[in-house]
């Protein structure tokens, strides 16, 4: 064979033969091949072609060789070779572009030299044939070609290898979809034998612009519409084994829509059901095994089409970048992700996750879609989450789900809208862990709420346990998971405060331990009763057992009521809180070092108040226990109670009683005193009834004083007090009618007083707490028979130093205190005498300096707001400002007012301005409720009616009188008169448990002085005065029968 033709020379074709058309349908190419093969013997020799090409590149003539020669002359200077059979110009190929002895592909000598039909570049036939399987483009000029001329033995003797149509196309041509032989699919098999051409074989362009461009506002589809579609498509794309055949029927567009939905919903592949098989996807592996890259191409093409939509050029560019980087970087490397982020934007991580999942799986694309498991939809990238929760939890256990729902509903009812829920329904461990961790991040504003009710969490846990015990005994199916704790009580058992009060957190932990130990010591032998206050803890133990099988609604209601009533109970807490605030305690002393800020005082007060509430719960159970088993109470060594009482009087006790341990110590103290006094009273009358009365009164007194102590937190505390007291009257069920009536009347009177006297009382108490705090302790201890009746059990200690000034109203003079201590109590019954001495000794010893006017002024400056509740039933003032429960309790007040009046004992209270209304009612009830001492009514009446008609301005003016202490002498005289009146009360009054509470108020002084004529009118028209919203000084609180028994 002679010298081979130059590279640029085309093969000449037979004269009269039409030039071969551009690649079109398969039938046309077949006919062209047949014609070419049939006419090979008529072609001119390659030598003639070489000579023509040597002179100049010539256009193949469609007619004859002469035309070809003339055409060669025309393009002699152009050095271009036009494309045969087309109007497009071909790229120039220099004659010496490729050495004759080297193949551009294998860089070795030619083996079976072959020429491409378009550019006539020559290569080894085997090299270019394999090349065409990958890309049907010339390696040199990148022109696509359709056939290869090879085995050229003569000018007219050669063979033509026509490429199979399925291999036509290129990655860089968006109008063609390149397919590998190994990725045979239904669509490809159908298109190979279809005469429709490559247009029908390419991926159907989605109707939109792609998921990536939706976020840019090009086209947006609402996510909530896609979620149902997404779920349906998931079901379609994950058929069972029996339905695998149906997967083949899904059209390509449906698959693209499905994938688009996954990207919109943010649903990622969770796992692949691959049976433990997986592939290596490292860059080194792909470099060593380039054939493994082939399976990635179809998936990449589809996913990029989903993301970019009709932007085919972007699809090709990103696909090229990915395929190039796969062998450079690991798929999980940051470099790989960084190269794709400019293109995929916020979908980069999702795409990489899907890509890695597919690359690692052992399946092809179709099998991967079938075996992939997807997570629930995550929030959309651009739109954010439209649901309230980004976590979807599906519990397989229905019982656990129901219990969770109950707990969630319980928390949602709480007024505390903070993220720190009160886990009153959780177990003890949950309380410790959850609340402690939450408190570590709480700010100082939350500390007031947090530290105060640490033991209330203990009580909540105990209550939960007790409820479980009750539900076991009960035949109903209702299981109470927990109750909504008041806002102030939701704190953990172990309090760990942030930054500024870390020492306080550790201190409270220690105090909490002390509290628990003392509670356990008292609850030995009857742990089921004293461990916590059950829903029936306000009832006697006998009643509690009888009501063990009450319906679930009664159980739930009584539980809530008991929680609040017990939070108001426990006179022992009252005593401890008063002493804890008046005497230096570790916590109080720290607050003084911090500047004696109101917030600090109120915080400590709220803490002690909460703790006392918890122990009041405990004490309520204990009280019921004592009623059930009096022998146990009587058998308890009296010396032990006396010892405890004397120990609690210590200043060391008062220091320990601060914050959490304050309530525990007060528990022992009040319990010992109430037990001691109850034993004395039991000699002459029903001890248990009086015992309940003492607990009841002190519980209310504590509640009221607690409110006044936290005046700085008036908005918060007052609402809480109102809520707790208004609800507490439900659970105040007792065999003692006085117990019921008083609780009811106190609650209702407090609500009436709410509107007008709330602001007045707030302002008044701010001044009165400081000026009267010194005499408060004396008055409490040296009050009237009523004071002594309350105190006998030690319950009537003042809740805080804020209570000290109220007693000063009853006893502003030191002479009155000493007289009461020496002679006044000797005149009264002996059972009151011993208790009074204990109380007067305690207050006289610890507060001798408080009796002076100078000290009163100093207290006025240092004390926070105070309200003296000498009578045990006056928790109403603290709860008086509860607006939410106001209407509800007014209705109940009207409903039960008549019954309560007839059965209630005498309760005489000279109250602060805010208690005026409730005390008016009390006096009214005294007129209607059996034998009473007229002297008491005379003593109470002068201050009642005038106050009910007082205006806001008048009361505020009277505040000024109080602040100036202009009426101290007058107060002393009036109170001495009151004392005389109390001395004249016959033992019958004491046996009926008539209790006189003397409270100091400037308005009360003026009423005592100027309004003596109102006694008759008050007694004759008590019901008319009760509704007055301004009545805020005095009221006789009469309990009511709880209709829940």
UniProtKB/Swiss-Prot annotation:
Post-translational modification: Phosphorylation at Ser-98 regulates the E3 ubiquitin-protein ligase activity but not the SUMO1-protein ligase activity. Phosphorylation at Ser-718 increases the E3 ubiquitin-protein ligase activity versus the SUMO1-protein ligase activity resulting in increased p53/TP53 ubiquitination and degradation. Sumoylated.
Cross-link (Glycyl lysine isopeptide (Lys-Gly) (interchain with G-Cter in SUMO2)): 73, 76, 83, 88, 159, 249, 701, 819, 837
Phenotypic consequence of residue 485 to R: No effect on sumoylation
Positions of region (Interaction with TOP1): 456-882
Chief location bin: nucleus
GO biological process, one term: regulation of cell population proliferation
Chain residue numbers at which the record places covalent cross-link Glycyl lysine isopeptide (Lys-Gly) (interchain with G-Cter in SUMO): 560
Chain intervals for the UniProt region annotation (E3 ubiquitin-protein ligase activity): 1-195
Span list, region Interaction with p53/TP53: 456-731
Keywords: DNA damage, Isopeptide bond, Metal-binding, Nucleus, Phosphoprotein, Retinitis pigmentosa, Transferase, Ubl conjugation, Ubl conjugation pathway, Zinc, Zinc-finger
Reactions this protein catalyses: S-ubiquitinyl-[E2 ubiquitin-conjugating enzyme]-L-cysteine + [acceptor protein]-L-lysine = [E2 ubiquitin-conjugating enzyme]-L-cysteine + N(6)-ubiquitinyl-[acceptor protein]-L-lysine
Impact noted for substituting residue 560 to R: Strongly reduces sumoylation
Keyword Protein transport carried by entry: no
Biased segments, Basic and acidic residues type: 539-565, 755-766, 816-825, 913-923
Post-translational modification Phosphoserine, affected residues: 98, 194, 499, 585, 718, 734, 864, 866, 912, 914, 1028
Required for DNA-binding: region residues: 51-374
InterPro entries xref list: Znf_C3HC4_RING-type (IPR018957), Znf_RING (IPR001841), Znf_RING/FYVE/PHD (IPR013083), Znf_RING_CS (IPR017907)
Start and end residues of each stretch annotated as Disordered: 1-35, 442-475, 511-692, 713-936
One Gene Ontology MF term: antigen binding
Amino acid composition bias (Low complexity), ranges on this chain: 521-534, 654-669
PANTHER family for this protein: E3 UBIQUITIN-PROTEIN LIGASE TOPORS
Function, as annotated: Functions as an E3 ubiquitin-protein ligase and as an E3 SUMO1-protein ligase. Probable tumor suppressor involved in cell growth, cell proliferation and apoptosis that regulates p53/TP53 stability through ubiquitin-dependent degradation. May regulate chromatin modification through sumoylation of several chromatin modification-associated proteins. May be involved in DNA damage-induced cell death through IKBKE sumoylation.
Disease: Retinitis pigmentosa 31: A retinal dystrophy belonging to the group of pigmentary retinopathies. Retinitis pigmentosa is characterized by retinal pigment deposits visible on fundus examination and primary loss of rod photoreceptor cells followed by secondary loss of cone photoreceptors. Patients typically have night vision blindness and loss of midperipheral visual field. As their condition progresses, they lose their far peripheral visual field and eventually central vision as well.
Protein name: E3 ubiquitin-protein ligase Topors
Record lineage: Eukaryota, Metazoa, Chordata, Craniata, Vertebrata
């Amino acid at each position: 064979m002679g010298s081979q033709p130059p590279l640029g020379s085309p093969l000449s074709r037979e004269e009269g033969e039409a030039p071969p058309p551009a690649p079109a349908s398969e039938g046309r190419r077949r006919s062209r091949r047949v014609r070419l093969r049939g006419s090979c013997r008529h072609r001119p020799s390659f030598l003639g072609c070489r000579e023509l090409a040597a002179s100049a590149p010539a256009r193949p003539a469609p007619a004859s060789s002469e035309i070809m020669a003339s055409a060669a002359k025309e393009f002699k200077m152009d050095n271009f070779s036009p494309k045969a059979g087309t109007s497009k110009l071909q790229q120039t190929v220099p004659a010496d572009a490729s050495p004759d002895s080297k193949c551009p592909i294998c860089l070795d000598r030619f083996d079976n030299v072959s020429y491409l039909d378009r550019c006539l570049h020559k290569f080894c036939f085997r090299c270019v044939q394999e090349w065409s399987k990958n890309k049907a483009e010339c390696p040199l000029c990148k022109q696509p070609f359709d056939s290869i001329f090879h085995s050229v033995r003569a000018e007219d003797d050669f063979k033509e290898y026509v490429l199979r149509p399925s291999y036509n196309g290129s990655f860089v041509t968006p109008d063609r979809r390149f397919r590998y032989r190994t990725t045979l699919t239904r669509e490809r098999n159908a298109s190979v034998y279809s005469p429709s051409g490559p247009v029908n074989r390419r991926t159907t362009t989605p109707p939109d612009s792609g998921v990536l461009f939706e976020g840019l506002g090009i086209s947006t589809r609402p996510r909530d519409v896609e979620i149902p579609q997404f779920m349906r498509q998931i079901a379609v794309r994950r058929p069972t084994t029996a339905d695998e055949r149906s997967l083949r029927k899904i059209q390509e567009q449906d698959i693209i829509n499905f994938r688009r939905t996954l990207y919109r919903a943010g649903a990622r592949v969770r796992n692949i059901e691959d049976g433990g098989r997986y592939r290596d996807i490292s860059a080194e592996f792909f470099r060593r095994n380039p054939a493994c890259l082939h399976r990635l191409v179809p998936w990449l093409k589809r996913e990029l089409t989903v993301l970019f939509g009709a932007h085919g050029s972007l699809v090709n560019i990103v696909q090229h970048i990915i395929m190039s980087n796969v062998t450079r970087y690991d798929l999980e490397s940051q470099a790989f992700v960084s190269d794709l982020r400019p293109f995929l934007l916020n979908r980069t991580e999702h795409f990489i996750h899907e890509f890695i999942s597919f690359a690692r799986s052992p399946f092809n694309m179709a099998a991967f879609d079938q075996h992939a498991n997807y997570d629930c939809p995550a929030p959309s990238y651009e739109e954010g989450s439209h649901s309230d929760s980004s976590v979807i939890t599906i519990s397989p256990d229905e019982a656990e789900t129901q219990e969770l729902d109950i707990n969630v509903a319980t928390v949602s009812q709480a007024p505390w809208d903070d993220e720190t829920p009160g886990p009153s329904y959780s177990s003890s461990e949950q309380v410790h862990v959850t609340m402690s961790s939450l408190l570590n991040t709480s700010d100082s504003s939350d500390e007031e709420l947090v530290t105060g009710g640490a033991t209330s969490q203990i009580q909540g846990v105990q209550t939960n346990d007790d409820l479980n015990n009750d539900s076991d005994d009960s035949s109903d199916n209702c299981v109470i998971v927990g109750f909504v704790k008041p806002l102030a009580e939701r704190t953990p058992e172990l309090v760990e405060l942030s930054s500024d009060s870390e020492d306080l957190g550790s201190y409270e932990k220690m105090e909490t331990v002390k509290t628990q130990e003392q509670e356990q010591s008292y609850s030995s032998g009857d742990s089921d009763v004293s461990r916590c206050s059950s829903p029936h803890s306000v009832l006697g133990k006998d009643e509690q057992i009888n009501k063990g099988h009450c319906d679930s609604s009664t159980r739930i209601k009584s539980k809530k009521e008991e929680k609040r009533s017990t939070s108001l109970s426990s006179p022992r807490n009252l005593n401890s809180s008063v002493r804890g605030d008046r005497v230096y305690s570790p916590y109080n002393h720290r607050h003084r070092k911090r500047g004696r800020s109101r917030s600090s005082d109120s915080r400590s007060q709220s803490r002690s108040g909460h703790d006392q509430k918890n122990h009041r719960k405990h004490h309520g159970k204990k009280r019921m226990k004592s009623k059930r088993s009096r022998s146990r109470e009587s058998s308890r060594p009296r010396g032990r109670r006396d010892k405890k009482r004397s120990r609690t009087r210590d200043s060391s006790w008062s220091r320990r009683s601060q914050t959490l341990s304050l309530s525990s110590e007060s528990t022992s103290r009040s319990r010992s005193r109430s037990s001691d006094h109850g034993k004395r009273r039991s000699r002459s009358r029903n001890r248990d009834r009086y015992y309940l009365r003492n607990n009841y009164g002190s519980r209310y007194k504590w509640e009221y004083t607690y409110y006044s102590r936290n005046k700085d937190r008036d908005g918060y505390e007052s609402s809480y007090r109102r809520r707790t007291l208004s609800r507490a009257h439900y659970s105040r069920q007792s065999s003692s009618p006085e117990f019921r009536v008083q609780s009811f009347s106190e609650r209702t009177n407090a609500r009436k007083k709410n509107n007008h006297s709330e602001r007045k009382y707030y302002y008044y108490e701010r001044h009165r707490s400081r000026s009267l705090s010194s005499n408060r302790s004396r008055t409490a201890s040296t009050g009237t028979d009523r004071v002594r009746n309350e105190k006998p059990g030690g319950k009537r200690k003042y809740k805080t130093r804020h209570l000290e000034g109220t007693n000063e109203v009853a006893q502003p003079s030191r002479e009155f205190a000493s007289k009461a201590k020496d002679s006044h109590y000797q005149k009264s019954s002996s059972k009151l005498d011993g208790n009074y001495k204990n109380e007067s000794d305690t207050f006289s010893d610890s507060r001798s300096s408080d009796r002076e006017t100078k000290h009163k002024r100093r207290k006025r400056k240092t004390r926070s707001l105070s309200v003296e509740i000498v009578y045990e039933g006056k928790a109403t003032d603290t709860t008086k400002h509860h607006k939410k429960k106001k209407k509800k309790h007014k209705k109940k007040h009207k409903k039960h007012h008549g019954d309560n009046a007839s059965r209630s004992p005498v309760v005489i209270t000279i109250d602060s301005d805010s208690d005026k209304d409730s005390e008016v009612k009390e006096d009214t009830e005294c007129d209607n409720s059996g034998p009473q001492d007229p002297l008491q009514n005379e003593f109470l009446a002068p201050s009642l009616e005038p106050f009910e008609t007082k205006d806001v301005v008048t009361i505020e003016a009277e505040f000024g009188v109080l602040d100036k202490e202009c009426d101290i002498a007058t107060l002393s005289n009036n109170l001495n008169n009151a004392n005389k009146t109390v001395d004249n009360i016959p033992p019958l009054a004491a046996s009926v448990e008539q209790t006189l509470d003397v409270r100091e108020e400037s308005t009360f002084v003026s009423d005592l002085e100027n309004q003596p004529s109102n006694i008759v009118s008050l007694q004759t028209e008590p019901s008319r005065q009760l509704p007055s919203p301004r009545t805020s000084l005095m009221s006789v609180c009469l309990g009511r029968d709880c209709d829940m028994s």
